[in-house]
Every structure is written in structure tokens, then in C-alpha cells.
Amino acid sequence: MRGGSKTAHEEAEAVMTAITLVQGDITRQSADAIVNAANSSLLGGGGVDGAIHRRGGPAILADCRRLRASHYGKGLPTGRAVATTAGELDARWVIHTVGPVFSREEDRSELLASCYRESLKVADELGARTVAFPAVSAGIYGWPMDDAARIAVETVRATRTAVEEVTFVLFDEPAYEAFATQVR
């Protein structure tokens, strides 16, 4: 430890991440970083992805296009995360992560957990202390809400991070209840 400052790893060990739940619209949340359940193209889509791009404005899409051109020509891989500006959202950054499509034939839970771990890693790299997550993969990607909530909460609790507060922003009462059951 030089000059009394802590390394990011030491800070991550010192912080216990608080988990809060909100029922509502993630695009109306105030946080250092808002996580987008993106599609691999990073160019917007349906659900949370479309809402974030619409409310955040053209700056988010412009950043996403730059990322596609410079690093992710074939798209962002499932389970990975990358940050852009937050545009007009009440945040400093949007962290885009690509969740897996649910499959009854193949266990993809590790890919879903990776979305949360990688998003927190990116948040740490940015210096974000508050992060708002949607229920990744639980919408149009068909992941059963109870299982999506279990994986999300267990992963956030198990991940070493300097993020002080994670807020799960759930779109309806059943989603909120599924996450509340896991947080208890």
C-alpha cells in the first residue's frame, strides 16, 4: 500500500455490497451505472435494450457503433460486458451485457452469472459505486424469473466488488416478488 491509498482489490474486500429492489422503469433510475440487457449487436432492440437506447438518446448508439467498429465486429459475446456513455439517462455510464437465451436442453446458468460478474468488473474499472440492474435474460430471452432472480442475487453476493449498492429494477410485481424471495 503506497501513500495510504488502497488498491482496488483491497477496497473490494472492504465493501459489503448492499442489494435493494425497486419495481419500475430502469431508464428512470439514478445510479453511477445502469446495466443494459443488450443484444449482441449493441445497436438497440426490444425490452430494456430498446428503452435504454430510446431514453438515453443518440450518444449511446454512437458509442455502441464505435465499439462495434473497433472491438466487436461480430457483436459482444454472451456473458461479456462493456460500457458506454449514459447519454440522457441519470447515470454516468451504461454497462451493456448480453444475456443467454434460456434453453431447456442446455444449462446456460454460468453465462447468466457471467453477465452480473462481468458487469460488476466493468463497474469497478469505471469507479462506479452504485449500479442498477434489470433482470437479465428474464424478458424476451425466456429465462424463468425465479431462477433468473436466484442466479442474479447469488452472483452479486458472491462477487468481490467495490460497488457499494446494487439495485435490481424489476418491471412488474411477479419479478419484484421473485427477487424479494432471493434477497430475504
Where are these regions (language model features)?
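Macrodomain-like recognition of ADP-ribose-binding/processing modules
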Residues: 1-184
